[in-house]
Design a protein with these regions (language model features):
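Alpha-helical transmembrane segments in inner-membrane proteins
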Residues: 2-364
């Protein structure tokens, strides 16, 4: 396998014409994988990783059952007091693993969707994908328990939501105005169906599932963590292969096709992968709103780099969700709320900002 770092041309040229190269090196893995190494992105990624580790340490150490920071290394290695081991293995550890994995999945799903639609509003949240996945998960869990696994129900619901939006808009998820209107309609129908299933068809379980409907990380287990991290493990190799074609796709279909990226196939693969990641996240934590909308936008502004910024979007998504979960566990204002309510409040403000910005630019 050819493994090396070099500057590579981004477009073909006729003989005698200088070939344009990116202003940053490219890591090549074999013939088909080329990953840009943007210096600012590397620095930002390292900073985000440090912040994520700090938020994770705070999650494990704060509160009545928290593990003191001085004892955290020993407890993580399997030593320490029984109460601390119990808190790590049964309470804080699974919740943290689910929060980080769900944030990564939502960040990646949003980055893929926004990149292939070339639209900052082209988020799984806005088009009703999360709500559709939540409806499918609720239906599988309550109406077909033991017959259809919850992740499969979420996947079916998410796929159906995307198909309906694409069919209604008739523009392949590209027109921002139609995308928003269709997404709002699909999300409203999916949420209505979810509430109907939870409150009418399964009244005895409504109280237990009320938090899940709004997006919650409470009472998570290692099984939930395994579900979302397995989906990520399966998706990462595909993401590595898709990173280059997705970046070229942002330049337009004609240029992407001319450079061998096959825009239509790239778009289809990215949407399918986004649906799978969103479904995995929703199946373990419920429809947590607006992480997939805000994480890619924050990553793009921090890095100032072209392309989908997949790695940074994943880190920002994890940091947002772990921090939001930390807030609902310990902040007096948000304590006790499902984490999805907090992300909805913050993300709703950001969505309003995006709508105003796109309207002023004449894109709505």
């Amino acid at each position: 396998m050819n493994l090396g770092v070099r500057s590579a041309p981004v477009s073909s040229a006729t003989p005698g014409t200088p070939v344009a190269s990116p202003p940053f090196p490219v890591l090549r893995l074999g013939r088909f994988v080329a990953l840009p190494l943007h210096r600012r992105s590397l620095v930002v990624g390292l900073a985000l990783l440090v912040l994520l580790c700090a938020a994770a340490a705070a999650t494990l150490s704060l509160g009545r059952l928290g593990v003191p920071l001085t004892q955290l290394p020993a407890v993580l290695s399997g030593r320490g007091e029984a109460t601390h081991l119990f808190a790590l293995e049964r309470l804080r550890g699974p919740r943290l693993a689910v929060a980080a994995g769900t944030g990564i999945a939502l960040g990646l799903a949003g980055a893929l969707f926004q990149s292939v639609t070339r639209n900052p509003l082209g988020s799984p949240d806005v088009i009703g994908l999360g709500a559709g996945a939540g409806a499918g998960a609720a239906f599988a869990a309550l109406m077909l328990p033991g017959i259809v696994p919850v992740p499969m129900g979420a996947l079916a619901g998410a796929a159906l939501a995307v198909a309906v939006v694409a069919s209604v808009t008739g523009t392949g998820l590209r027109d921002p105005g139609r995308l928003i209107v269709a997404g709002i309609g699909v999300a409203a129908m999916a949420q209505a169906f979810t509430h109907f299933v939870v409150s009418v068809m399964a009244r005895d379980k409504a109280a237990v599932l009320a938090a899940y409907v709004n997006g919650s990380l409470g009472a998570r287990s290692w099984d939930h963590a395994a579900t979302v991290w397995l989906a990520l493990a399966l998706a990462v190799p595909l993401l590595v292969v898709l990173a280059g074609p997705v970046a070229l796709n942002e330049m337009g279909d004609e240029l992407a096709d001319g450079l061998g990226a096959r825009a239509s196939g790239t778009r289809t693969a990215a949407v399918v992968l986004s649906v799978v990641l969103s479904a995995a996240a929703v199946s373990v934590a419920g429809p947590i709103a607006f992480v997939s909308l805000t994480a890619p936008q924050i990553a793009r502004r921090l890095s100032a780099a072209p392309g989908p910024n997949l790695a940074l979007s994943a880190l920002v998504g994890a940091l947002l969700l772990v921090s939001a979960d930390l807030a609902v566990q310990h902040a007096p204002v948000a304590e006790g709320l499902p984490v999805g309510v907090l992300t909805l409040a913050i993300g709703g403000v950001y969505l309003g900002y995006l709508l105003i910005r796109e309207w002023r630019r004449g894109r709505l």
